[in-house]
Amino acid sequence: MGYYKKYKEEYYTVKKTYYKKYYEYDKKDYDCDYDKKYDDYDKKYYDHDKKDYDYVVEYKKHKKHY
């Protein structure tokens, strides 16, 4: 079960970091260059989504061993 525990911890750490950034992002929206900010945001959002997806794929690959 070691892998699963590690997976869960890493997954939730990524999620927490992401939501924290997302919240700070929303807060700063008002005093930033709108277009540039949202381009950056889209990229970050995509990167985080991909990371979540990679974790799930990785987890499913290992799942059958436990």
Curated annotation (Swiss-Prot):
Highest taxon of source: Bacteria
GO BP terms in the entry: sporulation resulting in formation of a cellular spore
Annotated keywords: Sporulation
Family recorded in the similarity comment: To B.subtilis protein YnzH.
Protein name: Spore coat protein C
Organism: Bacillus subtilis (strain 168)
Lineage: Bacteria, Bacillati, Bacillota, Bacilli, Bacillales
Record gene name: cotC
